[in-house]
Amino acid sequence: MAEQQYYGTGRRKTSSARVFLRPGSGDIKVNGRSLDEYFGRETARMIVRQPLELVDATEQFDVQVTVAGGGPSGQAGAIRHGITRALVQYDEALKQPLSKAGYVTRDARMVERKKIGLHKARRATQFSKR
């Protein structure tokens, strides 16, 4: 267990991901399953790979992820955030290009709460003039 590993916690909406980067061949495992098996949509898989592709590290690391909460979109965003933080821990020089791409910043957008007297967060009952 002497091999080097880098850790990053990522969050998005209600999802949180714990990401471990270890030197390897580019294998990505999410909750014990392969990336293609875990995410059905290609866009979610693409989001997860973005930070590694940006710094040309797709074949350098094996990625081990534990993700919980939220849906596929939030989980993919959380994993991306975690991978980014782990890459910054690996090499501080990568922070500048990753930050420029907008991967370092935690996406603070959350679901707006439902208000009393409305159907949804903003949807009101239809207005009748007469």
From Swiss-Prot:
One of its GO terms (molecular function) is structural constituent of ribosome. Belongs to the universal ribosomal protein uS9 family. PANTHER family: RIBOSOMAL PROTEIN S9 (PTHR21569), SMALL RIBOSOMAL SUBUNIT PROTEIN US9M (PTHR21569:SF1). Gene3D superfamilies: 3.30.230.10. Keywords: Ribonucleoprotein, Ribosomal protein. This is Small ribosomal subunit protein uS9. The keyword Protein biosynthesis does not apply. The lineage of its organism: Bacteria, Pseudomonadati, Pseudomonadota, Gammaproteobacteria, Chromatiales. InterPro entries: Ribosomal_Su5_D2-typ_SF, Ribosomal_uS9, Ribosomal_uS9_bac/plastid, Ribosomal_uS9_CS, Ribsml_uS5_D2-typ_fold_subgr. GO terms for biological process: translation. Pfam families: Ribosomal_S9. GO terms for cellular component: cytosolic small ribosomal subunit.
